[in-house]
């Protein structure tokens, strides 16, 4: 005849096994849910895509590329005397690096006398300043910029000054040569950053 103590020990071991099993299952389920949630949130982030003439969060009209860059097509209409092009724009929640100034980008800034281009700008496109009749000073912070031959088409550049701050002597010389080909007849100055 077995005693109550002998019956109690196996039951106690059984309860421990059940509890260990439940705890392990709970931990495993929690880990799977956490991993799933992490994977799910990672796939939600929108990717850069090619779009033409879309409105950015700052009101500018831009064209975007799948590599995460953007071309400024038109700044928002303004009567400000000083206009600064943003180095980044956001379209549909995606941030794009502004690298190019497109045709007639400053046509809406008819009163602007000073235009500042960020260090991210790599290209000043054809007819970029066409329509910007009041501009007298252009500040360029880039180290190297390509200038299209018709960038200043229809603009009187004789009284215009371009100030550069990020160029070496060699880069400045090459930049001046490009400006000459583009018909620029104003002054180019190197200024401190």
PLM segments and residue spans:
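Bacterial Sec-dependent N-terminal signal peptides
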Residues: 1-19
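Sec-dependent signal peptide cleavage junction
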Residues: 29-48
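Short beta-strand/loop segment at the start of cytosolic alpha/beta domains
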Residues: 42-76
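Structural signature of tandem-repeat unit edges
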Residues: 60-68, 78-100, 110-123, 133-146, ...
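Short, aromatic/basic amphipathic alpha-helical patches
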Residues: 151, 170-185
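Bacterial N-terminal signal peptides
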Residues: 21-30
């Amino acid at each position: 005849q077995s005693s109550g103590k002998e019956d109690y020990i196996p039951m106690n071991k059984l309860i421990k096994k059940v509890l260990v099993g439940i705890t392990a299952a709970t931990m495993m389920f929690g880990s799977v849910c956490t991993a799933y949630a992490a994977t799910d949130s990672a796939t939600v982030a929108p990717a850069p895509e090619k779009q033409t003439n879309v409105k950015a969060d700052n009101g500018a009209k831009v064209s975007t590329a799948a590599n995460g860059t953007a071309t400024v097509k038109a700044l928002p209409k303004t009567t400000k005397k000083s206009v600064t092009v943003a180095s980044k724009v956001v379209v549909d929640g995606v941030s794009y690096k502004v690298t190019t100034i497109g045709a007639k980008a400053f046509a809406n800034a008819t009163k602007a006398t000073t235009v500042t281009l960020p260090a991210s700008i790599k290209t000043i496109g054809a007819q970029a300043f066409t329509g910007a009749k009041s501009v007298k000073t252009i500040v360029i912070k880039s180290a190297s910029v390509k200038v299209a031959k018709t960038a200043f088409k229809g603009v009187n550049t004789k009284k215009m000054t371009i100030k550069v701050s990020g160029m070496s002597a060699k880069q400045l010389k090459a930049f001046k040569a490009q400006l000459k080909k583009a018909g620029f007849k104003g002054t180019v100055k190197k200024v401190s950053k």
